[in-house]
Every structure is written in C-alpha cells, then in structure tokens.
C-alpha cells in the first residue's frame, strides 16, 4: 500500500474547478518545502543555470513507534526528530540499491495454514516482544479487512488467496520491524532476492473488479512508451486517490504496457516510507521521496536541516531527467482526493500551478525532449483515505473489491497556451488549468463507465475506453 503525496507550492493558487463540475469542499492540500537550487547546465542547454523552487526529499528512515496504547500511530514530531538524527549519524547514498539481502529474521508467518494460526502467530510474536502491540493491532485489522474484500469478489479460491498474500505481507512487515529499511531520496524498486514489486501486484490484484475496470486511450500509452525508448522524458500529471494507486496503475497496464508498469517513478510523500504497514509495498516501487511542508515546522529547530537535506532529491530528479527515458508520476494537488462532505461525490482535487510549472521547467532544462500528459485515475473504493488529512502517521484501512479506471489524455502544448498570453503568471495558471480540465473530463468518463454502469459506452470522442485483459 502506498501513501503518495505530490509536490505543491506553499504560496501559489490552485487551478479553478471547471464550471461543469458541482462545487465541493477540498481537504487541506499537502504542500512541500522549497529550496532555491542552482543546477549547472547540461551539455545541450544554455549556459545560464536553472533556478527552481521545488520540493525536495530527506533521506528517510522509519520512525520508531510510540506508545502501544495508540493504534498504529506515533508522533510526527518525534518521528522526524529521530529521522534527522539517524540521517546525521551516517552517510548514505542518494540512490537505493536495487537489491536487499534479507537479514536473519523470524519467518513465523510463512508456514501458517489457517486464519487461526495466523492470528495466533500475531499474538505470539507480540508476547515475545518482536511486535509492538499497535503494529500487531494494525496487522489484525489489515487481515480482516483484506479478507472481507477478497471474499466480496466471489473468487472460489478466496481462502487460498487471502492466506497466501497475507502471510507474505505480515512476514515483510515483521522483517521491517526487526530490521527497518532505509529509503534514499531516489529509491529503486527492490526486485531481488525478494521481488517486492511482484508481491505488491499479487496483493492488490484480487481487489480489482477487472470486469468493471477500464483504460482510456490505450494508444496514447503506446505513444508514451515509444517516446521513452527514444530517450524522451515523460511526466504524468495525475490526480491521486488511494495508497494503492501505483499497484492499480501497474495492474491496469501490465498486459499492454509492462515497461511503463514496472519503470514508472512515483513522487512519494514521507508517509509512504514511514508507516510500518505501507513500507513493504513502497519498497517495490521506484520513488522520489519528498517531505511535506505541512510537517516542516513540527520541530522548528530542525526545519533548516530538513531544507538543506532536501536539495539532494532535486538534484536526483534533475540528474535522472538529464539521462532521458524517465517516466515520472506526480499528483500536483498535494495529496489524495477527498469526497465533498455534503454530497459524498469524489472529484480530482485542484492542481497547484507552481508544482506543474516546476515539473515543466525541469523537463525543459533537462537537455532531453520532454512531455507532460494529463492522467486520470479512479479507484477510491478500493482503499479510501480518511475523510480529512491527518497529522499522525498510521490510519484505519478500509478495503473493498471494486472496479477501477485509468486514462491518459493528449499532451497539452505549453507554447500554444503561452502564445496567447503575456503575463507569465497567467500562462502558468492557464497551463495548469488545461491539464486539470483534461484530468477532470477523463475522470468523469471513467466515473460514468464504472459507477454509472455505462461501461464501454461511456467513451467519448477524445476518451476511448477499452478492457485489454478481456
């Protein structure tokens, strides 16, 4: 599971919501810290340096858990203090190795044959002092909710699927409790000796109702993959709905575009690499880790240290883009979509124009051809977020079996929008709004297909739905 948070400026305004959408309330956006960084020009760019205000990342290590009387929650302030202390205590690489040698650890969960044995094992490991009681409570809740969702699918092998997937998940969670994994600003998916990517795919797959799931504009995904193979960079400007977004995106594309599914890099918030129930799933994804400004001042005396540490992630992203052939997913709303509290309707949260513009400028100065595409994702029922953004790490995970949707829109030309406007701020806002409008339109088509039961007939002129797995 993943908590993915996007880059967001602390001062810029958001794109307006299209008039075609009903009014709705937005949860507070998650904004990130910015540092001014000058980057030397690439060989193919001009001699002037690129200066950006862009959110950057710390080198993260998992914070220690607080009182077991709280349910899988710990102080964000304490967590960050320990994180900074760990970072300053040792030099670590900016990019995580793509392998992780499993250290000796309890493998108690792997040989279980029933629900009774699984629950008993959680209690036994807790009594032995190997599991904090709050993590154990989280494991039990995750098991029950996952079991209910898989059984909801009607799969005749639900018993086998639940036990197989949950024993592996609990084994990986316990391993990380015993030997916490440390994420670097640029984390590469760990595929061996244990394949964390395949583990995440297998875990989320039973939650997707593929008969009621759709992909929009499959031909554009093919175009994107061709551009990547030609050395171009591509950034997908997307909405963000659940912790499981990366797995859902990959599962919807694994039949037709496995290269995209496996090589996408996600801009990820600090929660994705701190929550003990999320970390094993995050280890299997390519990440650029960022820290939300919302928590920057939790411990004021550490704020400057964090900002200085953040410069490493900007440099990592810039270097990646200069090498070409990079595919980066980012949600410039600053967090997961939330429903309108008065109607319960879900819509993509507005984009932060500065975040969009920063990504555009990074592409422009990379020295390789770059493209921004609007991407829409509908999957909130699989694992909806809390109704409000929470400060504490750890959240109740409601899980269900449901249809999902993914659609990409045509690339939107910045130059065409800039040609009709003189004010740079107006250009920036107009470009961000154009991307958002495309995402909102695609989202409405997916919503009509899935929630409205229109299926493939929901397709419109510029959003062609398909089900390539059928």
From Swiss-Prot:
User: Which residues belong to the transit peptide?
Assistant: 1-101
Gene Ontology molecular-function annotations: glycerol-3-phosphate O-acyltransferase activity
Give one Pfam hit by family name.
Acyltransferase
Q: Which GO terms describe its cellular component?
A: chloroplast stroma
Record's keyword terms, sorted = Acyltransferase, Chloroplast, Lipid biosynthesis, Lipid metabolism, Phospholipid biosynthesis, Phospholipid metabolism, Plastid, Transferase, Transit peptide
Q: Which InterPro entries match?
A: G3P_O-acylTrfase_chlp, G3P_O-acylTrfase_N, GPAT_N_sf, Plipid/glycerol_acylTrfase
Sorted alphabetically, the Gene Ontology BP terms of this entry are:
CDP-diacylglycerol biosynthetic process
| Protein localization | Plastid, Chloroplast stroma
Region spans: Disordered: 87-106
**Short motif (HXXXXD motif): ranges:** 240-245
Q: Does the keyword Signal apply?
A: no
Catalytic reaction annotation: sn-glycerol 3-phosphate + an acyl-CoA = a 1-acyl-sn-glycero-3-phosphate + CoA
Its annotated pathway reads:
Phospholipid metabolism; CDP-diacylglycerol biosynthesis; CDP-diacylglycerol from sn-glycerol 3-phosphate: step 1/3
User: Its Enzyme Commission number?
Assistant: 2.3.1.15
Entry similarity comment: Belongs to the GPAT/DAPAT family.
What information about domains appears in the record's comments?
The HXXXXD motif is essential for acyltransferase activity and may constitute the binding site for the phosphate moiety of the glycerol-3-phosphate.
This molecule's function is given as: Esterifies acyl-group from acyl-ACP to the sn-1 position of glycerol-3-phosphate. The enzyme from chilling-resistant plants discriminates against non-fluid palmitic acid and selects oleic acid whereas the enzyme from sensitive plants accepts both fatty acids.
Q: Name it.
A: Glycerol-3-phosphate acyltransferase, chloroplastic
Q: Which organism is it from?
A: Cucumis sativus (Cucumber)
């Amino acid at each position: 599971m993943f908590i993915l948070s996007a880059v967001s400026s602390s001062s810029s305004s958001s794109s307006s919501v299209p008039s075609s959408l009903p009014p709705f309330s937005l949860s507070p956006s998650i904004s990130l810290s910015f540092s001014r960084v000058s980057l030397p020009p690439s060989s193919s760019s001009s001699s002037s340096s690129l200066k950006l205000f862009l959110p950057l990342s710390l080198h993260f290590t998992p914070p220690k858990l607080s009182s077991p009387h709280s349910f899988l929650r710990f102080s964000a302030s304490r967590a960050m203090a320990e994180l900074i202390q760990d970072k300053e205590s040792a030099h670590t690489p900016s990019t995580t190795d793509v392998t992780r040698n499993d250290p000796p650890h309890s493998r108690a969960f792997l040989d279980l044959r029933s629900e009774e044995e699984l629950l008993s094992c959680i209690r036994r490991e807790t009594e032995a002092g190997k599991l904090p009681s709050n993590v154990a409570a989280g494991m039990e809740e995750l098991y029950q909710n996952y079991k209910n969702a898989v059984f909801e699918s009607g799969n005749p092998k639900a018993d086998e699927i639940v036990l197989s997937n949950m024993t592996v998940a609990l084994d990986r969670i316990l391993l990380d409790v015993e030997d916490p994994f440390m994420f670097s600003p640029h984390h590469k998916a760990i595929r061996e000796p244990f394949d964390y990517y395949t583990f995440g795919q297998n875990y989320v797959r039973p939650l997707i109702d593929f008969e009621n799931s759709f992909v929009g504009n499959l031909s554009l995904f093919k175009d994107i993959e061709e551009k990547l193979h030609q050395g171009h960079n591509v950034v997908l400007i997307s909405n963000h709905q659940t912790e499981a977004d990366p797995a859902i995106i990959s599962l919807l594309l694994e039949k037709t575009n496995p290269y995209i599914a496996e090589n996408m890099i996600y801009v990820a918030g600090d929660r994705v690499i701190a929550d003990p129930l999320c970390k094993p799933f995050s280890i299997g994804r390519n990440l650029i880790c960022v820290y939300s400004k919302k928590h920057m001042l939790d411990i004021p005396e550490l704020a400057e240290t964090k900002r200085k540490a953040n410069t490493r992630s900007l440099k990592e992203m810039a270097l990646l883009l200069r090498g070409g052939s990079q595919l980066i997913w980012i949600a410039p709303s600053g967090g997961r979509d939330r429903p309108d509290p008065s109607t319960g309707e879900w819509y993509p949260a507005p984009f932060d124009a500065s975040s969009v513009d920063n990504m555009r400028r990074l592409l422009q100065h990379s020295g390789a051809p770059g493209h921004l595409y609007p991407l829409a994702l509908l999957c909130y029922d699989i694992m909806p977020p809390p109704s409000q953004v929470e400060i504490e790490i750890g959240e109740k995970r409601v899980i269900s079996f449901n249809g999902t949707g993914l659609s990409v829109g045509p690339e939107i030309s910045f130059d065409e929008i800039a040609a009709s406007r003189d004010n740079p701020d107006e250009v920036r806002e107009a470009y961000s709004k154009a991307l958002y409008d495309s995402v909102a339109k695609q989202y409405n088509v997916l919503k009509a297909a899935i929630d409205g039961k229109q299926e493939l007939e929901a397709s419109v002129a510029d959003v062609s739905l398909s089900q390539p797995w059928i």
